[in-house]
């Protein structure tokens, strides 16, 4: 997975650091960060990542809207998106998949094996 570009979109600095730390332990990724959906859209327009970890509840623009807009962009359908949420409500996973997310994770992301499995499945290569 070396060289794969991953964008972590998370407004909570602690959650963002934990996920970035886990990703660095798994593989040699080019990791970028954003703190809201608007920043994520700007980064996707400039240089689309291979995969995005997208928090669903953020200020300025939430992950629901950012995912919808990414999917509407030219080439946006090739970016893999994993939805993240700390307050998993009934139906959130189904809604995330319906708006275009490829997978779903509850926060905090504490299981490195689960993250590795999702990366391998969505990026198509072994970590």
What residue spans do the PLM features occupy?
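Receiver (REC) domain active-site loop signature in two-component systems and cognate sites
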Residues: 58
């Amino acid at each position: 997975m070396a060289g794969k570009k991953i964008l972590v979109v998370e407004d909570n600095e602690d959650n963002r650091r934990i996920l970035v730390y886990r990703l660095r332990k798994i593989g040699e990724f080019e990791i970028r960060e954003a703190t809201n959906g608007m920043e994520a859209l700007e980064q996707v327009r400039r240089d689309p990542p291979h995969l995005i970890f997208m928090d669903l509840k953020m200020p300025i623009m939430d992950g629901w809207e950012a995912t919808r807009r990414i999917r509407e962009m030219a080439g946006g359908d090739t970016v893999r998106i994993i939805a993240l949420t700390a307050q998993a409500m009934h139906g959130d996973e189904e809604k995330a998949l319906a708006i275009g997310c490829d997978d779903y994770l509850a926060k905090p992301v504490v299981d490195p094996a689960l993250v590795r499995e999702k990366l391998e499945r969505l990026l198509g290569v072994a970590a």
